[in-house]
Amino acid sequence: MNNYDKKGVEFLAKIYDLVGDEELDTKDSLFEVLDQIRLKDGCHLGLRLAEKKGMGDNSWFYTYTGEDPLKNGTADIEMLREKRRHIYDDLIVEQTNMGAWQAYLLFLSPSVLPLWWHENYIGRTFFFDRENFKGIFPFRCEPVPLKIQDIPEPSVTKRKDHFIVRCPNWNDWEGLVLDSLNLSFDEDGNISFDNFKRKVLYEFHSGICF
């Protein structure tokens, strides 16, 4: 388990705590774990949970100032989606390998937050603790195939003008996949993601269709 794995374990544990604690005024404490990211002055973190209606829904974090628009009843779904898209405008990310890794974790958070119906297709299982691999859908009762027991570790590589983040994960309709994306900072520290790729290392389809 490397340092990225360890931070991933902490991140998932914190996610589950935040989802389960509806009494919290804000979700700002996520950045006690993602400690290479901080909110800009006056900003707070909120969490919109998937609604169990319609053909599918997902959950996401968003930022706000003043009162939480979801709690005071002034938010609509499109407003929260817009806040989600621009969440990094209200965050300061350290330009380090660990900062890039934590930005990736936040970027992928909808895939580990609660999902409803068709949105389950985006769900991921991460293997920050390699023992978790034995608990995923196809291998609960069957041995893990030898060729995928050696799962690549998460990694972050710094290039001249960007970071490359790679992370293995499992999806019940793709199999074992290696995520790869580029993360860049402009001269003002604003962050952007591009060249997002998913390479299938071991193909699997659960057969479940929504």
Range-by-range predicted roles:
Residues 50, 64-65, 129, 157-159, ...:
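A structural detector for beta-sheet-dominated domains
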Residues 26, 30-33, 154-158, 165, ...:
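Generic structural motif
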Residues 29, 59, 109-111, 155, ...:
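Generic serine detector
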Residues 33-36, 52, 156, 179-185:
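Assembly/interface hotspot detector across virion components, adhesins/toxins, and nucleic-acid enzymes
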Residues 125-177:
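Acidic, glycine-rich flexible loop segments
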Residues 17-20, 73, 123, 150-156, ...:
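Short, flexible coil/linker elements and helix-boundary hinge sites characteristic
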Residues 1-145:
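Extended, low-hydrophobicity segments enriched in charged/polar residues
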Residues 163-210:
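C-terminal, beta-strand-rich globular interaction domains
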